[in-house]
Design a protein with these regions (language model features):
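Active-site-proximal beta-strand/loop segments in catalytic clefts of secreted hydrolases
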Residues: 1, 12-13, 48-51, 80-84, ...
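Exported/periplasmic ABC-transporter solute-binding proteins
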Residues: 121-163, 167, 171-187, 194
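Hydrophobic alpha-helical segments within soluble ligand-binding/sensing domains
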Residues: 10-42, 90-91, 141-145, 161-180
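Hydrophobic alpha-helical
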Residues: 63-64, 76-148
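Sec-exported extracytoplasmic/periplasmic mature domains
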Residues: 23-31, 65, 69-73, 95-103, ...
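Extracytoplasmic ligand-binding site segments that recognize negatively charged/polar headgroups
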Residues: 12-22, 43-67, 76, 83, ...
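Loop/turn elements at helix/coil->beta-strand transitions in domains of secreted/extracellular proteins
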Residues: 4-6, 42-44, 70-77, 102-106, ...
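Hinge/cleft segment of the Venus flytrap/periplasmic-binding protein
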Residues: 42-52, 56, 67, 164-214
Length: 214
């Protein structure tokens, strides 16, 4: 980044997305005792991860789990599956985990919406009744993910403000061409612009889906 004075990074922090996913899960668990179906005082969960060793995947998972624990949720990890951010792979991995753990699974944390939707696909393919579904949570706020939240299939997601990032990149590019840097943009370490994630539930999913610039 320091090799060229006009090189900048615009994006979001993976840690924040994991923290917010954990907060969504904790809020739901505290507000709805039915999540803990076997009433053993702890939440049995599985994780669907992106590609092995990927920094965002590791950070999202660690921070989601740590946030749940910091909110007083006792956890038991049953399993995890690597699905490379892919819906079809997530369906296959989830079917394997259902085969191993059946109705023990109470929470599915997916590193992105596509994998969360793949997990839901697995339950549907196995003809498991929705009343026996665990809680599913994703990250990114894709159109498909937002629609699943609106349909109450996905309990929540964490919205990656790609429209805000695109606007920031366009504004920065125009300024750099004119030989200046916008004074109203916040930079970290001089070269990094981070746009915040935000939590999405059924209460605001439609608003996110209809966001200008999509």
């Amino acid at each position: 980044m320091m090799q060229w004075e006009k090189l900048y990074y615009v994006g979001a922090k993976a840690k924040q997305s994991g923290v917010m996913q954990g907060e969504l899960a904790a809020e739901l668990i505290h507000s709805d005792r039915r999540v803990n179906r076997n009433r053993d005082g702890k939440i049995q969960y599985v994780v669907l991860e992106g590609e092995p060793g990927h920094q965002d995947s590791i950070i999202r998972t660690e921070n989601a789990v740590d946030t749940l624990k910091n909110n007083g949720i006792e956890l038991e990890k049953l399993s995890y599956g690597v699905a490379n951010w892919n819906r079809a792979q997530a369906q296959n991995r989830m079917m394997q985990m259902i085969g191993q753990h059946s109705n023990e699974i109470e929470l599915v944390l997916a590193n992105n919406d596509d994998m969360a939707l793949g997990a839901i696909d697995a339950y549907a393919k196995l003809n498991i009744t929705e009343s026996a579904f665990p809680v599913f949570l994703g990250i990114d706020g894709t159109d498909a993910g937002l629609r699943a939240v609106m349909d109450a299939k996905l309990a929540g997601t964490v919205y990656n403000d790609k429209e805000g990032q695109a606007a920031a990149m366009a504004k920065l590019a125009v300024s750099l061409v004119s030989g200046s840097v916008p004074e109203d943009m916040e930079f970290e370490n001089g070269r990094y612009i981070y746009l915040p994630y935000y939590k999405v539930t059924i209460a605001n999913a439609e608003e996110c889906l209809e966001k200008p610039g999509k």
